[in-house]
Regions:
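N-terminal glycine-rich FAD/FM-binding segment characteristic of electron-transfer flavoproteins
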Residues: 1-193
Length: 193
């Protein structure tokens, strides 16, 4: 992000949640990066951490909720990526991952480094107390300039915009005891069901 992400308040807010240290890209040049350039910067940042073998992201972090940031970073790193993850445990040289699927969950064992996009229920984050916040101010935070990562901003120009074509609504109100049956019939005839 821009220079504000390295402020004392941001540092304390992040490090008071239990992290040992922070490595931050705090550069005004990063303010207008698109998702691809942000992913390249994050991958370069991960490479700076010796022995890093897992990158945890939120399920829809900084990419306008598109759920693509974890996959983009994984692509730059050459690591596998798993999304919708509700639990992660270390197992020897790899990880045991519990992933939500349309039909329930599945457990995956993967060796080596991995990018994992966790769901909001993957962990309960404690609310930091005053002691945690004060101690966070003493923890190390290294700030990296975007130029030090070798990432160049990608120029994007919006060349046009279109609104979806408005569709005329039927404005049909179904009532009576058989309203549900009528609704199902109407949806079937419209090709929705």
């Amino acid at each position: 992000g821009d220079a504000q992400v390295s402020s004392s308040m941001a540092k304390k807010a992040a490090l008071s949640r239990g992290f040992d240290r922070a490595l931050v890209v705090a550069d005004d040049a990063a303010r207008d990066l698109n998702a691809t350039a942000v992913a390249a910067a994050l991958a370069a940042l991960v490479r700076k951490v010796e022995g890093a073998n897992i990158l945890l992201t939120g399920d829809s972090s900084i990419d306008e909720s598109a759920k693509m940031m974890s996959a983009l970073v994984a692509g730059y790193l050459g690591w596998p990526c798993f999304q919708e993850v509700s639990a992660v445990e270390a197992n020897g040289n790899g990880w045991t991952i519990t992933q939500a699927t349309a039909s329930g969950t599945r457990t995956i064992a993967v060796d080596g480094p991995v990018v994992v996009a966790v769901t909001t229920d993957a962990a309960t984050v404690k609310v930091p107390g005053m002691k945690d916040v004060l101690q966070a101010g003493k923890k190390p935070m290294d700030t990296v300039a975007l130029a030090d990562l070798g990432v160049e901003p990608i120029s994007v120009e919006v060349t046009g915009r279109l609104r979806p074509v408005a569709q005329e609504r039927k404005k049909e109100i179904l009532s009576g005891d058989d309203a549900a049956v009528k609704l199902v019939e109407a949806l079937r005839s419209a090709g929705v069901l």
